[in-house]
Amino acid sequence: MPELRQTCLDLLCLADPNDKALQVQAWGAQPWAVDTERALPEPAGIPGRPLRPVLMAHTDIKPARLTTPEGHAGLLHAVCHIEKNAVDLALDVIWRFAGMPHDFYLDWWQVAQEEALHYTLLRDHLRSLGFDYGDFPAHTGLWDMAERTRHDVLARVALVPRTLEARGLDASPAVKTKLVSIGDHRAGEILDIILRDEIGHVAVGNRWYAWLCAQRGLDPVATYPGLTQRYQAPRLKGPFNLAARAAAGFTAQELLQLQAPSSTSTPASINSSTQSAALTAH
């Protein structure tokens, strides 16, 4: 019987994102041995990355107009890059953090499989338009937060699924509207699949954040602002997809705080354009 955490580390090290997504999906939901206590040594060079896309600060990425083929494909590429990084993050949280309950690892393995599907759907759609993943520059925002939270599983689940990925719940409807407005109904269908699954992924983050807070004797709501400050998480700007956030397990108190004037200040890293929301959501 294969061991899940070592397998996820091996997959994370793969440089080819297409091969990585294929292998994650091929492993599937088979019976796994899970060594929850073993501290795995960290190899150099993770995550494995291809030579393309070129990585740069998101503020240096200048998307073309959406009504051009390059602008259309560029927006899809930005979302595809988010999903590629989401595969890496799900694999990383499994191998990196020992000592969690068995179900923690199985939950994130399910997330990894769904993120791999999302990446594949978007990559295939890009190819149908004459482009491919790697044809446009991309940023490292999601993995940068992973690096900052690499030593604390509480910070990781608080600030990746519950913060950056939850921003994807907010951005998804507007991105879908833009793509459908230029006639890309297939992209709209894919984004519907992603939104459905991402609600579940954020719910996994919420569930394990609450569990970890309970284990450490912390109040989840009171603890969160301190984590965002310590790890330099971006403040989020509305509009917020409150229905999706509620479905993902955010409490009524959290949703009310999210709508408070102090929580909707615009940080330098987020602007009001739909395309930039897609670029910076993760």
Give each language-model segment a name.
Residues 1-282:
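Non-heme di-metal
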